[in-house]
């Protein structure tokens, strides 16, 4: 079974409270999504492999730890996942960015794919999938399935908030994919929205519906 990590750092919780507030406008919401993603990325990358290298300092030659040469790809689920990308890129500026376009059918609540563009060497990369909301889990499950069909093997899922139902669904469908969240909320309502949630992340990020 995959590991579920709730990253409850005080700065993350503080910013998340502002993001939940319906009075917070798109500009501030967008900035805080990026900031929280950057703070979360510290924990999401904790288990990346290191290797020992020899470095010459101004004083002497010494051995240091560096990332083990494994390439990283950030794959946002469009459109809301885009809001988290720059925060992760600030810590991993050499990462490539793929895109998976999925939207949720409001009647069936099922995800529908409309776009997919990934790095050609996706099978060699350590992948961080970003999506602010893990509600039913349908979009995340489909995005991860698509990545695996393209050869991806090393995948982490990074969300701002999630419902227990969505977390359980992803774990059942992809028990090898670890999940990282800033908050595990109470439940889904009858419309499939996270409670208490923060509204529609895409709408609030971009100021459109």
Swiss-Prot record:
Cofactor entry: Mg(2+)
Regulation: Allosterically activated by GTP.
InterPro entries: PRibTrfase_dom, PRTase-like, Upp_B, UPRTase/APRTase, Ura_phspho_trans
Sequence positions that bind uracil: 194, 199-201
Full protein name: Uracil phosphoribosyltransferase
Keyword entries, A-Z: Allosteric enzyme, Glycosyltransferase, GTP-binding, Magnesium, Nucleotide-binding, Transferase
Cofactor remark from the record: Binds 1 Mg(2+) ion per subunit. The magnesium is bound as Mg-PRPP.
Family statement drawn from the similarity comment of this UniProt entry: Belongs to the UPRTase family.
Gene Ontology BP terms: UMP salvage; uracil salvage
Source species: Clostridium acetobutylicum (strain ATCC 824 / DSM 792 / JCM 1419 / IAM 19013 / LMG 5710 / NBRC 13948 / NRRL B-527 / VKM B-1787 / 2291 / W)
């Amino acid at each position: 079974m995959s590991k579920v990590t709730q990253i409850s750092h005080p700065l993350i919780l503080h910013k998340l409270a502002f993001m939940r507030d319906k009075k917070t406008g798109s500009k501030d919401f967008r900035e805080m999504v990026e900031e929280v993603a950057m703070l979360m990325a510290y924990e999401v990358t904790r288990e990346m492999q290191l290797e020992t290298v020899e470095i010459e300092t101004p004083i002497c030659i010494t051995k240091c730890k560096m990332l083990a040469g494994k390439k990283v790809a950030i794959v946002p689920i469009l459109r809301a996942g885009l809001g988290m990308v720059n925060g992760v890129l600030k810590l991993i500026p050499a990462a490539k960015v793929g895109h998976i376009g999925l939207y949720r059918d409001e009647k069936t609540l099922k995800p529908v794919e409309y776009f997919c563009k990934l790095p050609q060497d996706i099978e060699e990369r350590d992948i961080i999938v970003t999506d602010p909301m893990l509600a039913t889990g349908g979009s995340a499950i489909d995005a991860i399935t698509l990545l695996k069909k393209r050869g991806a093997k090393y995948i982490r899922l990074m969300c701002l908030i999630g419902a227990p139902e969505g977390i359980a669904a992803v774990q059942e469908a992809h028990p090898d994919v670890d999940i990282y969240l800033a908050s595990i909320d109470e439940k889904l309502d009858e419309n499939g929205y996270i409670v208490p949630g923060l509204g529609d992340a895409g709408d609030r990020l971009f100021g459109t519906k």
